[in-house]
Amino acid sequence: MPVQAPQWTDFLSCPICTQTFDETIRKPISLGCGHTVCKMCLNKLHRKACPFDQTTINTDIELLPVNSALLQLVGAQVPEQQPITLCSGVEDTKHYEEAKKCVEELALYLKPLSSARGVGLNSTTQSVLSRPMQRKLVTLVHCQLVEEEGRIRAMRAARSLGERTVTELILQHQNPQQLSSNLWAAVRARGCQFLGPAMQEEALKLVLLALEDGSALSRKVLVLFVVQRLEPRFPQASKTSIGHVVQLLYRASCFKVTKRDEDSSLMQLKEEFRTYEALRREHDSQIVQIAMEAGLRIAPDQWSSLLYGDQSHKSHMQSIIDKLQTPASFAQSVQELTIALQRTGDPANLNRLRPHLELLANIDPSPDAPPPTWEQLENGLVAVRTVVHGLVDYIQNHSKKGADQQQPPQHSKYKTYMCRDMKQRGGCPRGASCTFAHSQEELEKFRKMNKRLVPRRPLSASLGQLNEVGLPSAAILPDEGAVDLPSRKPPALPNGIVSTGNTVTQLIPRGTDPSYDSSLKPGKIDHLSSSAPGSPPDLLESVPKSISALPVNPHSIPPRGPADLPPMPVTKPLQMVPRGSQLYPAQQTDVYYQDPRGAAPPFEPAPYQQGMYYTPPPQCVSRFVRPPPSAPEPAPPYLDHYPPYLQERVVNSQYGTQPQQYPPIYPSHYDGRRVYPAPSYTREEIFRESPIPIEIPPAAVPSYVPESRERYQQIESYYPVAPHPTQIRPSYLREPPYSRLPPPPQPHPSLDELHRRRKEIMAQLEERKVISPPPFAPSPTLPPTFHPEEFLDEDLKVAGKYKGNDYSQYSPWSCDTIGSYIGTKDAKPKDVVAAGSVEMMNVESKGMRDQRLDLQRRAAETSDDDLIPFGDRPTVSRFGAISRTSKTIYQGAGPMQAMAPQGAPTKSINISDYSPYGTHGGWGASPYSPHQNIPSQGHFSERERISMSEVASHGKPLPSAEREQLRLELQQLNHQISQQTQLRGLEAVSNRLVLQREANTLAGQSQPPPPPPPKWPGMISSEQLSLELHQVEREIGKRTRELSMENQCSLDMKSKLNTSKQAENGQPEPQNKVPAEDLTLTFSDVPNGSALTQENISLLSNKTSSLNLSEDPEGGGDNNDSQRSGVTPSSAP
């Protein structure tokens, strides 16, 4: 029975007794069949036949010469000249001796593999020959030259060695970088395609799945089947690419094709290819054949990497290559080598090998070939010795790749463990190709190299994780290259931004939700650049969990994070706005950062930072500018970035204490907590935000809406009037459907004029801007560090100028009322009742704030996102631009108009909760023109009070006289606006006019002036709006008359009535919204400017029902207007 042949690497031991050959008892005797056995085992054979292939041994064993080549490899003494009796003459003997000498010399290249038991193979003794060359050389060494069959085998082995040598030389002259590209180019040139190891394997398995049962399918059906199955895992799969894979199999003749008349042919898989192994082998064979046709010579290990992505299929590929070899392939390879040498100049003079190679190529490899003569044998072996020597010489002296050319690419485990074969057996059959270490020195060398590579890997991994979280790696990695991971110590903010400390996440959104708002997800900060000053990387790096509680929830009400977030110790508001910081892409989403205001000096004017991008005060802050995500505009850096609102709240609304760290960081979305430069909201939005009429500069810049804005980028033409630092602060790009994007202001010219008047009034108020702390006694007002001078017209510039950190921290929505209004996402008119009485607002500021939050949430939940002029999807969080809880820390934007969002009833709110917004209500209007900006309560400067006059509803009322005058003016403006609104209502008879009015009213909601017609929330149809407009117009006529009568009433009464009326109006149908005028009046009347909570609103509505009736002409008209504008008036208690 045949014995299993040993591994070719065990050529130094007897395959029968497994003992190493020696020169005494176990002399190696080679048989004509190519097997070598020790003489002792041969003598014990029962039959004179090879124990492995049963070939008969015709020659006397004693006459067979010892294989001296193997003896020299085992270190044994080679016997001197052995008598050869099998040679017919002296000449033959001479040829024999020369041939044997050639074999012995070639065998020396096997010395590194010479011992399976201890000679050892290490990095210095590894053979320069490749594994295929060594294997072919072993075959040659085992040939018995005295036997005729042995000589035939020796010639074939010599030819094979010569052919492999040519291939090796061609490989040495190839550019490995171009090898794969040349291969796939050749494959594509034949209408085929390789999709990569994993995808190609799946595609082939699916083809087999469809056809293994013998079914016949058309090519189209087969391709569709494969594509549909591949799509879940490989979305890039296409009919074209899969069709090319099928073409590859078709080219390989794997299908039995049945043609049909006037119909597509049917393809049936041939029976021999209905297993994956057979199909894959034919597939691989076809690719190898294409490569050979293209003149490419690729090593088996390279094939394994290309087709399988590993090194475990080298033998498989080698067998395919061998089968594809033809007698003509050798001569063709010689020609290709000649061409390659001409291209390189042949520095090693390899052309001298050409005659020898041609001689070897002319050897007939067929088994039926006649046996060679002794002379032919000698010539053939001399030629193969010459070409192998030439190859070794070239590899050692001229090759750039050297002996390691076949080594697979290094990876993390490459040669970091000892080779098992080397340890156990003292030698490794894989030689230089082994991926394990063969010596301790080699092991230590690669382990050290691996350690150097490790740090980079974790970084990329951490970046990948951050990306998964939604943080762009650019935002994560600042120019400094520091990666700020939550676990890592937050590095100082780049570009002069001071990190507030690990406890406060600088990038925390103002939203209450600790989790990043999906819209705010860092991943959405696509435009943030690592180099952007105040780039999120550092800011993001340490996001305290407490801060995380201040997640960038665009919709969520600002978290009452102050408690959660320790006040940031930032003296200066962090400058989160990069100079050209991509952090604040034009499409900046509101990046919510903690408002570490408490730590920062309250209202410290934020000087424009060098890196900060400041837009002219009148212009909308770049933050609102929404450049294409690809080119995020650096938001105007507010020196006082919105101080983390958390700190504001933590500081008990001591604005001064909380630096405005992130104003620029907060992008387009208006957060109740951030102060935005008077955003160019649709006036409706502004009206909604605060009853106080606010001049809203026409939106010159696309709204700042972050990602959600991105959808509306072109629509976003709104820019805050003054780029308040807070307004500017880019926030994480949000896509919150409710991102607070004021609808583009579309007020009629008259309304614009009214708004301008309001702005003037607000400017005056701001000049006086000593806003007594909002009635929210409970919350200590942070002393505003605002400089009254700076707050005036500079408000537009406030973002950069406001030294009062609080202002910079204030966001238009920063005020409690406003915050809640904003929190309600423009607190919907329904939800928000215009605060008519300042006292009520003050008294119930907290409770109302909570109610406002509820209202805001509801409003946000309502499908009417009136503020969003861009479409059904609201840009502002459904909970309000600033929906926040009393604890939410709001960073006051720079001196921004402090206005109570009309929907936000002012409650006695802990300013600490809204620390940035002393008068929450008034500040909520901060989105308005900076003139209306209101310093934090308790810290309001006179200017603040002035702004509070209008913001009176937002903050403490100005001195009664001034207040009343301002109120009168505001009321007049409101009446005018309402009248204009009525006129518009008449014009709105047509649906288009109605829609425009609605947009205006929406805009008006955000500001006292009649809002431009913003897009109505998708909830309200144009027909409904038109009907409402007609009704409103009728009511307006009535109320106008009533108002004229009521105008006679004292201004105080009017303000109170307006407030109460707004409170009631805030209750009206969502469609009915308080006109901007009413809102402004109510806000001016309402000291805190904060919207009443629903309960307070209900109470106010009940109490003021009679007042409303009397003031309905005015308030009702306004309400109707506001309804048209889509804003619900909010009443301040």
Swiss-Prot record:
InterPro entries: ROQ_II, Roquin_1_2-like_ROQ, Roquin_domain, Znf_CCCH, Znf_CCCH_sf, Znf_RING, Znf_RING/FYVE/PHD, Znf_RING_CS. Zn(2+) 1 binds at C14, C17, C38. A zinc finger (C3H1-type) spans 413-441. Widely expressed. Expressed at higher level in cerebellum, spleen, ovary and liver. Residues 89-173 are annotated as: HEPN-N. Residues 1096-1110 have a biased composition (Low complexity). Residues 327-396 are annotated as: HEPN-C. GO terms for cellular component: cytoplasmic stress granule; P-body. GO terms for molecular function: CCR4-NOT complex binding; double-stranded RNA binding; miRNA binding; mRNA 3'-UTR binding; mRNA binding; RNA binding; RNA stem-loop binding; ubiquitin protein ligase activity. Residues 1007-1016 have a biased composition (Pro residues). Residues 505-542, 1000-1019, 1058-1078, 1094-1133 are annotated as: Disordered. Pfam families: ROQ_II (PF18386), Roquin_1_2-like_ROQ (PF21206), zf-RING_5 (PF14634). Its EC number is 2.3.2.27. GO terms for biological process: 3'-UTR-mediated mRNA destabilization; B cell homeostasis; cellular response to interleukin-1; lymph node development; negative regulation of activated T cell proliferation; negative regulation of B cell proliferation; negative regulation of germinal center formation; negative regulation of T-helper 17 cell differentiation. Keywords: Cytoplasm, Disease variant, Metal-binding, Phosphoprotein, Repeat, RNA-binding, Transferase, Zinc, Zinc-finger. Residues 1058-1070, 1119-1133 have a biased composition (Polar residues). A zinc finger (RING-type) spans 14-54. Proteolytically cleaved after Arg-510 and Arg-579 by MALT1 in activated CD4(+) T cells; cleavage at Arg-510 and Arg-579 is critical for promoting RC3H1 degradation in response to T-cell receptor (TCR) stimulation, and hence is necessary for prolonging the stability of a set of mRNAs controlling Th17 cell differentiation. SMART domains: RING, ZnF_C3H1. The RING-type zinc finger is required for proper localization to stress granules, but not to P-bodies. This is Roquin-1.
